[in-house]
From Swiss-Prot:
One of its GO terms (cellular component) is cytosol. It holds the Pfam family DUF179. This is UPF0301 protein ML0028. Belongs to the UPF0301 (AlgH) family.
Amino acid sequence: MVIRPEDPEDYVAPAAQRVRAGTLLLANTDLLEPTFRRSVIYIVEHNEGGTLGVVLNRPSETAVYNVLPQWAKLAAKPKTMFIGGPVKRDAALCLAVLRIGADPDGVAGLRHVAGRLVMVDLDAEPDLIAPLVDGLRIFVGYSGWTIGQLKGEIERDDWIVLSALPSDVLVGKRADLWAQVLRRQPLLLSLLATHPIDVSRN
């Protein structure tokens, strides 16, 4: 259940996390729309213009090598393109996890998002990026909300706002990231991780 603050503009979620770049949106158990069911969305931008994020747990069958071969070596396994959301499926967006201690300042093609996460310009030179990152993920499309739209969905309990770990962005194809994120939360939230993937079994 979402905590209701006194100021409706300062909406927060169960872990008292404000929506901002670097947080996660976790689909609540009642959100059954196929595009976002059990989705984990990493917020890349959140400002007065709206909110932009990418779904972390929707791998495609398209190999990175077949689309952007120059980046295949740096792509985390599985080395496939991930479906970031329903908006602009003809565009690609890349996130990378910096190595501990790496400094992206002044490096052409890198833009800091939050913590150890950076956005990578896919026109940049991979050899310049490689020494700085543990791995990267390339997304086709993204998830977007206009001003106030995401606020309404959170108030409707469609989403849970939680902290992200750098490893969330590079999680493997076989991992159930939705359940993993919930299991590391306090007791009441962690219990949601047992919610069946097939709701007919509930």
